[in-house]
């Protein structure tokens, strides 16, 4: 190794440490990793059936008619930030104004409806205006992709002392194919205008990687303990639920805030199919394997054994 190359590597190592974002596990050197694979998602153009609209509209009306009394709690704080009433009314009126409803759910990445549990760490407006936020979002994603690849034993575990230049030589698209395509795992169908990695004909986000890892660990626990159901408290948009269903079949129940459970119902029905999801206001049928309920229904749950309770994707 030439002296100049040694000096360059040592300088890169020092700079990587100085500029390291400690939310990342792996060191990235100042050399820019290509950004051409990253962009704002704009390709979700799902056909929404009348059955879908009737089902989600009825659930929204159920939530509106059964909302609990306002208290000085987290839900009250979120309600002041998120325009929940307008969202709820739009979904309730979806049968009358189908175009407005479809426009909202396909492009809600521009809205603040997912405040606190969204796909990105920053809002669309912040990411669009500032390159530094997009760069951080990119590094968070690649950092977790490397960790997930290490978990699957696709690559050796990187030692931070090795520096960022080793990481930059990884073929990220190849790793993505090894994890998703070869395992026949389909990405979660989230809304447009989130910032992520362009993969095949879809997009992947940090929440996809985290949801898949959580699903793998849940699968291990579920099978090793002969359990009968998974219950998630605060399930966000449903990333973990979606990936659990990609890995194995089980009864999966989610409890969450009203507007969050409504959003989860929408995107899980798009991702998993309308008949796979049972909403609280409906009768159960044999096809239902995902159950979505508002948080106050948790006190009606009488099950005591063979259930895995967990919390992963919430505040």
List each model region and its residues.
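Membrane-proximal basic amphipathic "stem/tether" segments
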Residues: 1-77
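Conserved SAM-binding loop of SAM-dependent methyltransferases across substrates and taxa
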Residues: 237-248
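Conserved SAM-binding motif I beta-strand of class I
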Residues: 251-257
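A short SAM/SAH-binding and catalytic strip from SAM-dependent methyltransferases
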Residues: 307-315
């Amino acid at each position: 190794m030439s002296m100049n190359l040694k000096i360059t590597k040592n300088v890169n190592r020092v700079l990587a440490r100085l500029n390291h974002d400690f939310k990342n596990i792996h060191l990235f050197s100042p050399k820019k990793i290509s950004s051409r694979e990253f962009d704002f998602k704009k390709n979700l153009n799902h056909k929404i059936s009348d059955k879908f609209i009737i089902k989600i509209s009825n659930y929204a009306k159920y939530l509106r008619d059964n909302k609990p009394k306002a208290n000085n709690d987290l839900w009250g704080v979120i309600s002041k930030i998120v325009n929940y009433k307008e969202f709820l009314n739009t979904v309730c009126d979806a049968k009358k104004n189908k175009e407005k409803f479809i426009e909202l759910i396909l492009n809600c990445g521009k809205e603040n409806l997912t405040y606190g549990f969204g796909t990105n760490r920053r809002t669309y407006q912040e990411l669009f205006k500032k390159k530094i936020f997009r760069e951080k979002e990119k590094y968070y994603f690649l950092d977790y992709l490397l960790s997930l690849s290490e978990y699957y034993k696709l690559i050796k575990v990187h030692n931070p002392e090795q520096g960022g230049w080793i990481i930059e030589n990884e073929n990220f698209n190849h790793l993505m194919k090894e994890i998703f395509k070869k395992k026949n795992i389909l990405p979660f169908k989230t809304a447009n205008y989130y910032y992520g990695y362009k993969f095949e004909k879809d997009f992947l986000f940090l929440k996809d990687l985290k949801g898949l890892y959580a699903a793998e660990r849940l699968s291990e626990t579920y099978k090793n303990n002969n359990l009968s159901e998974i219950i998630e408290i605060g399930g966000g948009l449903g990333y973990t639920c979606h990936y659990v269903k990609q890995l194995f079949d089980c009864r999966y129940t989610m409890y969450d805030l009203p507007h969050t459970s409504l959003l989860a119902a929408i995107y899980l029905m798009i991702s998993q199919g309308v008949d796979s999801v049972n909403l609280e206001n409906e009768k159960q049928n044999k096809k239902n394997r995902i159950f979505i309920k508002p948080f106050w229904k948790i006190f009606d749950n009488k099950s005591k054994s063979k259930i895995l309770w967990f919390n992963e994707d919430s505040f």
